[in-house]
Amino acid sequence: MTIPNTIPITPELIAGHGLKPDEYQRILDLIGREPTFTELGIFSAMWNEHCSYKSSKKWLRTLPTKGPRVIQGPGENAGVVDIDDGDCVVFKMESHNHPSYIEPYQGAATGVGGILRDVFTMGARPIAAMNALRFGEPDHPKTRHLVSGVVSGVGGYGNSFGVPTVGGEVEFDARYNGNILVNAFAAGIAKSNAIFLSEAKGVGLPVVYLGAKTGRDGVGGATMASAEFDESIEEKRPTVQVGDPFTEKCLLEACLELMQTGAVIAIQDMGAAGLTCSAVEMGAKGDLGILLELDKVPVREERMTAYEMMLSESQERMLMVLQPEKEQEAKAIFVKWGLDFAIVGKTTDDLRFRVMHQGEEVANLPIKDLGDQAPEYDRPWRESGKQAPLPANLVAAPKDYGQALLQLVGSANQSSRRWVYEQYDTLIQGNSLQLPGGDAGVVRVDGHPSKALAFSSDVTPRYVEADPFEGGKQAVAECWRNITATGAEPLAATDNLNFGNPEKPEIMGQFVQAVKGIGEACRALDFPIVSGNVSLYNETNGVAILPTPTIAGVGLLPDWRKMARIGSANDGDKVIMIGVDGSHLGQSVYLRDVLDSREGPAPEVDLFAERRNGDFVRSVIRNGQATACHDISSGGLAVALAEMVMASDKGLAIDLGEGKGAPHALLFGEDQARYVLTVPADVADFLCANAEGAGVPFRRLGTVGGTALTVGDLISLPIQQLRDAHESWFPDFMEGRGELAAE
């Protein structure tokens, strides 16, 4: 009994596949006939935003992607950066936004699984994960359910697979009510001379399917990820993939073992658009055709059509081009790990993508036009309007500074994330040196006495909305600053660019300006972008998310014994601020959460100052002079000091002294390129003299000691009172306790 592959191609079917009339006409011109149903599915998957980057490619090319340590930049499964001693770090961040809104547990879990596969496909063993999460406003009826499901999914997969979650972000805003963001990051370590790529080489070589069996889960997932949501969202539940972290753990071990044998010519994980995308990418990159025999694909459901097999996004699967003489050795490894191993095709020299099913050719398409020569758009865009200046004297000061600070540290967006990260295994593998809650996660490099890597993920969407160019710069600068605050040298970054509908010129303008800002900051800070992901159409019923270009970065610590933490100050240490006095209250959390206003421009990022101040701070830490360090970001100096007090369990006596400007601007201003350092009292004068000599602005703030944070006569808060406010919001919210949760 044959399975039908013939379905009439109607305008409704074409539109349902996300193809515009002009794109369908391009298909007709390209192949000179009507496509089969399977071919329509293949074009739909390969020409959508998720796989082709057709709206963003033009602008992504402007980003700096090279540097002395960059081994592999964008275009592969993940970026690769040299960390000395013949080792490299392999990392990437990507989104699983649309599936996680529809089915939060599986959407988030398979997001983690997908990014881990991207890393070990390259030959690297994963050593760290992070996730940047954005949810709707806390009192939206779906938010608590989504937070619970996503956090369980991230933890369930990462913990079972065995990778520590070392950092991330969780934020709430009404603009994410209809589209949450789940951006997952993973990093692994490999030998620099043993990196595996996806470019197929050689004609007539076997194309091998590895891993789990193919089912109907995730069919059309990539197409869904390239569309806006509307009222029919619940119908999309079947397009969410289902993950199994134990199978993935076996796949990791089998792949790394196979890579030792010299059998692998090219390897690609099956992610978006499954078998279609992995086969096309391998062939197109190597200027080769691919012939697939679907009757040989391992399936776990009956009567699957060619269309379903080609577009299934079942998890834990790989595609590989193999040295033919190593076939039996390779197969034995996968059988040992309980995984499928099937030769499902071969490479050809005709640049065609041909798919056979039940003896019939169901697809015969030009492979380059599906892959690296897919359509590309130069969409119309316009710049965002500038926000009017907002001098500090036009912003009301709080009646009670202590109360304002308690309100900030206990707010939805500034409170402790302990409830979240305690559900993640942060210590597995035994190399974690800094856990979530500080500036960056730090993980020791196995087999090396002193080397470690620092990881951070950052973006301030309210800044990007107010000024996409400065907001793009700030996301890069804050990531660079967080890594620097541990004493690490920032090496390279990965971007995850989440925006609304690019067909709207104002949204496309946000994207273009943010990418320009990211590029400028990366060039100024020698912080190249080596991998990334773009997620567009994050809109529901015409309401777009806040523009959210997440930047995740990696830094190198040659000696982790000289690393700085935010909570390691000693009694009697002196507190010194590096950078200018706070003055900028536009778009600050003080303005938003205390005064309920969202006005003013985003803070400007002076990249020269960012570099100068950061390099100075790093040298202080590496010279062993700093006992603690924390960067100043959302909430300004006051929140940074409060976080240090809570982390160290030691009070601070602060005197703003000669600070120029209004106290609320000094305390809550969100000016950039700033850090708080604590140093032994006998080092303070020396450090200040060095800062002066290097042209680095600084201010002596006070002394470590006592059991309270005091700032002149403005603030006097016992550590426990700060901690109670900081730690209570999240558990209260998740347990639905009273008014607190609805604030």
From Swiss-Prot:
Pfam families: AIRS (PF00586), AIRS_C (PF02769), FGAR-AT_linker (PF18072). GO terms for cellular component: cytoplasm. One of its GO terms (biological process) is 'de novo' IMP biosynthetic process. ATP binds at Y53, K92, D495, G532. Mg(2+) 2 binds at D118, D269. Mg(2+) 1 binds at E94, N533. Pathway: Purine metabolism; IMP biosynthesis via de novo pathway; 5-amino-1-(5-phospho-D-ribosyl)imidazole from N(2)-formyl-N(1)-(5-phospho-D-ribosyl)glycinamide: step 1/2. Belongs to the FGAMS family. This is Phosphoribosylformylglycinamidine synthase subunit PurL. It comes from Rhizobium leguminosarum bv. trifolii (strain WSM2304).
